[in-house]
Structures are given as structure tokens and as C-alpha cells.
A protein has these predicted regions:
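Single-stranded RNA-binding surfaces
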Residues: 1-180
Length: 180
């Protein structure tokens, strides 16, 4: 077992534990997968991410910036010596809200995916191609230029102050969600 503890001023704030060597495929994990099957009737794809069962990716979970993310990952994989800067990647057209997965993926394609639901019984993990990194106070989302504030912060003046502050420190090419 691996345990990670977060402390502030010598006070324990958070503890995370994970079984070493166990294939957890936990929510939030990010994988580089390969499309194994396209299922037009489900408007979904099955993706190999290394789990014994293929993972499920629905069209609506591609995310609007899917084509831009694919372009970035393709550049990253083709030249591993130089990591491309996200804000310098040319933005591609957004995916249509009512599109078909076969218009964007084919068998054998590789893509970056994130687990949104852990595998259970006979089913593999559920995936999203809209990658986000969740921290304690923020969610960082590449290729989305928005700053959003949690609805739990209801005072408009505080929401505006936080938006302005976060906008001034946000890295180029990323969106941020402020959490409570």
C-alpha cells in the first residue's frame, strides 16, 4: 500500500491510499488507449486501456475540444523530445453536439482518455476524452479558455473577484473551475 499525506502547518489535511500493483483504474486516472471497436448503434467506442475488459467511450464524452486534444497528443507522440506548448496548438473545430462517433474515431486510433467510472463485475471502465486535472481548489481543463466558479459561491461580488483573480494567474490554453 502507498499512502500520501497532505499537511499544512504540521496539521494533517488529507490522506490518500492506493494498493501497490493493483490494477485499480480509478476515477481520474489518465491513459493512452487504442480504439478496438466502434458501435454505431450505441454511438460509442470500446477502447483498450490495459484493463482485462475494454473500456467504454460514448460520443458525448469526447468533449468539444476533442480534435484539438488529438492534434496536441499526435504532436507530442511524434516528437517526444519537445513537449508542445498547449497555447500554441491551433484550435480545431468543436465536435458537433449531435454527431456520430464514427465521424471522429476509427478502429486502431489512439487517444488520451480519463476514467470517469471504475470497472464493475463484467464491465470495463467508462471513459471521457475531455481530460481534467482536479486539485483541492481548482479543476484544470486544457483547451478550454473559460474561468468558472462553483455555484456554491453565491455572492456575485465574490464570484466576480475570484474570476478576475483566477483569470490573471491562469496558464494560457487552459480553463479553470474554482472549487469551494
Amino acid at each position: 500500500e502507498v499512502a500520501i499525506a497532505l499537511t499544512e502547518d504540521d496539521r494533517l489535511m488529507e490522506v490518500n491510499r492506493e494498493q501497490r500493483g493493483k490494477d485499480t483504474f480509478a476515477v481520474g486516472n489518465i491513459y493512452y488507449g487504442r480504439v478496438k471497436k466502434i458501435m454505431p448503434a450505441l454511438n460509442a467506442a470500446f477502447v483498450d486501456v490495459g484493463h482485462e475488459k475494454e473500456a467504454f467511450l460514448h460520443y458525448l464524452d469526447l468533449g468539444t475540444a476533442f480534435l484539438t486534444t488529438q492534434k496536441y497528443v499526435t504532436k507530442l507522440v511524434s516528437d517526444r523530445r519537445r513537449i508542445p506548448e498547449i497555447h500554441k496548438i491551433e484550435r480545431q473545430p468543436e465536435c458537433a453536439k449531435e454527431g456520430q462517433i464514427a465521424d471522429y474515431l476509427k478502429v486502431g486510433d489512439t487517444l488520451l482518455v480519463q476514467v470517469t467510472k471504475e470497472p464493475i463485475n463484467s464491465k470495463g471502465p467508462r471513459l471521457s476524452a475531455e481530460i481534467s486535472i482536479t486539485g483541492r481548489n481548482f479543476v484544470l481543463i486544457p483547451f478550454i479558455e473559460k474561468v468558472m466558479v462553483s455555484n456554491k459561491i453565491s455572492r456575485n461580488s465574490e464570484r466576480g473577484r475570484l474570476k478576475q483573480l483566477v483569470q490573471s494567474i491562469k496558464p494560457q490554453g487552459f480553463g479553470l473551475i474554482v472549487l469551494t
